[in-house]
Amino acid sequence: ESLGITVQAYTSAVGPVKIDHSKMDLEEISNNRLYMPDKKAAAEAESYLEDMIQRKDSCGGVIECVVNGLPAGVGEPVFDKLDAALGKAIMSIGAVKGFEIGDGFEAAASLGSQDNDCFIIGKDGRPCKVTNHSGGTLGGMSDGSTLVMRAAFKPTPSISQIQKTVDRYGKEREIEIKGRHDPVIVPRAVVVVEAMAALTVADLLLMSMTSRLDKIKKFFKKEEI
């Protein structure tokens, strides 16, 4: 934040219930226990989770994270790509089974003419993108626009239904897990995704500061980089 960079994560989906991005209100995140920036979606998700509890089952969900204020050029074109580093960090979180940046998997069904982010000259006289399908990355580096990523979490494996398993003797058994278990773990992981994204961006920023010899010389001479 001291560099003008903000990292914000929130729940964008609980099971089949998804937020409406056109009606997003980030101030709504702290007003519900699911950390969803959509009041209507949060209410629907709460109802859906009540149904999960009654059915002794669980569901997964999606956490979206946006990074604003990140300057262009953070990352590397090959070995330390920004999107690859973020993918490694986010996929290291327990229960994460999928990761995407920008349009992600939806881009696979798009045409090049639909997915390409066109550039224009903005009001400040500098080049800017009309769209952000790439999610703020280009060639492994940040492009100066909002960085958008999503992490897919699997359903909580600890459910109260009777399930089949095999014991240590190789015999088929049935197992019934006792105790209280969350029907979804996504809300608990929002702050984890946010922290992992922030740590990764900070790490790459430090690497960027020492990526060129002239920058290193300025650092040791205590000059402004």
What are these regions (language model features)?
Residues 35-43, 76, 80, 84, ...:
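Electropositive phosphate-/nucleotide-binding environments in soluble metabolic enzymes
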Residues 32-36, 88-92, 123-126, 173-177, ...:
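Glycine-rich loops and low-complexity Gly/Arg-rich segments
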Residues 158-225:
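Internal helix-turn-beta structural module
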Residues 3-11, 52-63, 95-107, 208-219:
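Flexible, glycine/charged-enriched surface loops at secondary-structure junctions
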Residues 55-172:
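Glycine-rich anion/phosphate-binding loop at the beta-strand->alpha-helix junction
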Residues 1-78:
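Glycine-rich, mobile lid/loop segments that gate access to catalytic sites or pores
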